[in-house]
Design a protein with these regions (language model features):
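Extracytosolic ligand-binding ectodomains
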Residues: 1-152
């Protein structure tokens, strides 16, 4: 990434009519702080099963509450395990409060907006459990917008 970004940004600047979109991997979110400007300039996309925009009110509130409760910042890892635990717990506890023992048959009706981790469960087979098939596309547009797209 560190080798290709300067080359691609140079190409886009020298040939502004060229259509360049950069598509990357989930671990690219770990490089956002270092390459934010290039990500916007190159209209960058990456896919991930987890992502949070730290500027959204829910993320800000969660981060402040985490700091208050635990007296420290969340580790800079991806996924952020504090948020992963919250999203997972909230999803299933809310589901149990709504549907009780019928949650398994109503997973597709859960319409919560998580902070970081999405859920879309699919049964593996009649005798097995479920797998989470939720994937997001994260896009950094040339207009400096950060968009988290649901991909079902």
């Amino acid at each position: 990434l560190i080798k290709i970004l300067p080359q691609l940004t140079l190409l886009v600047r020298e040939q502004p009519d060229s259509r360049v979109h950069l598509f990357g991997y989930p671990e690219w979110q770990t490089y956002t702080k270092d390459h934010l400007e290039a990500f916007f300039e190159l209209d960058t996309y990456f896919y991930s099963s987890f992502y949070t925009n730290n500027l959204l009110p829910a993320a800000i509130t969660f981060t402040k509450s985490y700091r208050k409760w635990y007296g420290k910042e969340m580790d800079e890892r991806y996924p952020k395990f504090g948020m992963l635990g919250f999203d997972t717990g909230y999803f299933f506890l809310k589901g149990l409060s709504r549907y009780g023992s019928g949650l398994e048959k109503n997973l597709d009706k859960m319409d919560l907006v998580p902070i970081q981790t999405g859920f879309k469960f699919q049964r593996v087979n009649n005798w097995g459990g479920f797998i989470n098939r939720k994937v997001f596309f994260v896009r950094f547009t040339k207009n400096f917008e950060l968009i988290k797209l649901d991909f079902d």
